[in-house]
Amino acid sequence: MTDRYARQILVEQLGETGQQKLEKSSVIVVGAGGLGSPALTYLAAAGVGHLGLIDMDTVAASNLNRQFLHGERDVGRSKADSALDTLKAQNSEIEIRAFDERLTVENASTLLAGYDIILGAVDSFETRFAINQACVTLGTPYIDGGVNGFSGSVLYSHPPDLPCLNCIFPTGSSNKRNTGVLGTTAGTIGVTMANLALLTLLGLPNPLRGKLFLYDGLRMRADLIDIQRNEACPVCGIG
């Protein structure tokens, strides 16, 4: 155990046993942008032993207000390659794999198989639904995040016990990209996703079981609202 984790090992709910759990754990994050940057950064810093990331986009100047895995010199580069370099420089003691390809319904299960938890950190509902469908098929917990302006949400999904993304956001939901987003909103939601992943990996109580986390940065408040499975859901339902 290296000194880099010494301070978090002092946390009562973690300790050396918890750190060893993290070292043996695996998480994959779809998206290395505004949500993926904080989520991946803090999962790597915490010592999650096996990280994966998927992103087929390239770095644009308009990304730099919130996507801090990338810098000015990375504009035009593959986000997957840029994020991989940054994360390796941050923590060389963990395994990190990067996939520079588009995730689709057809390849999602193959790309996401074998991980303990899957994080969806993308702005496309089409991709989020593809991740969700794969997670239902694989039986893997899914943490989904979304942001818009000063607002954001986090959903923890693990059917058949908990609602899936499709139960809460029907497939007709807006797929509009290029909505306004503040860097601090993306940071708050991305860190919340990472924190929830750590709670799950450590076997600690999950406050988002059957709840949807809603964040309002304008009013500086967060709320948990009750959610339920849709038994007629075409993805996870029984009907």
Residue ranges and their predicted role:
Residues 1-239:
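Adenine nucleotide-associated cytosolic modules
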